[in-house]
Amino acid sequence: MATVQIGRRGFAQVEPNHLSGIVTGQILAQLPVDTATMGDIIENGRFAKYDYTKGKVNLTGPGEWMLIYNEEKLYDERKQNHKDFAMVKTNYTDGEIVPRLISTVLGDIYTTNCFGKANTSDFAVVDDGIAIDDSDLSAVTFAINKTTGYLDVVGGTNDANLDKEGPIFAIVKIYTMADGQPGVKLMRIK
């Protein structure tokens, strides 16, 4: 029985192994983020809701949870990698972040290291990501933390904040991200 720590250096990453929302056009990208509640840095792999009534992307709207997955814009491939991309408020002239949200359905599979909490510096190590007991991966499931939009382990320390009525994800495999960091391949099961 071993414990695998899934932390990250830099920003969270997503590898869209099989996200059907991309193919079927279930993508929304017209509303700005409510930075007062979601912060000034939006990472790939986080979840949010499309709140048409307030005209914002936030964590409390009446809509479904959708995966934030934006096109990575890295301008120096010699010095930058997937971990260096996030949507940062100060990078936009109007100060508004307009992310791309993708609907996930049962059976969708993607790989990520986006767990726990936001990384506010691209050089900071988020060492308190999640610890996974890899002796029985079928027993580990993830739900969305309603207060942060990040995935967390069902039955873990943040269990009271999890939306267990929303999407639930199971581990397919402990994996490695493109830059060598630990990651988890997930499949939506509910």
Which residues does each PLM region occupy?
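Surface-exposed, low-hydrophobicity beta-strand/loop segments enriched in small/polar/acidic residues
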Residues: 1-190
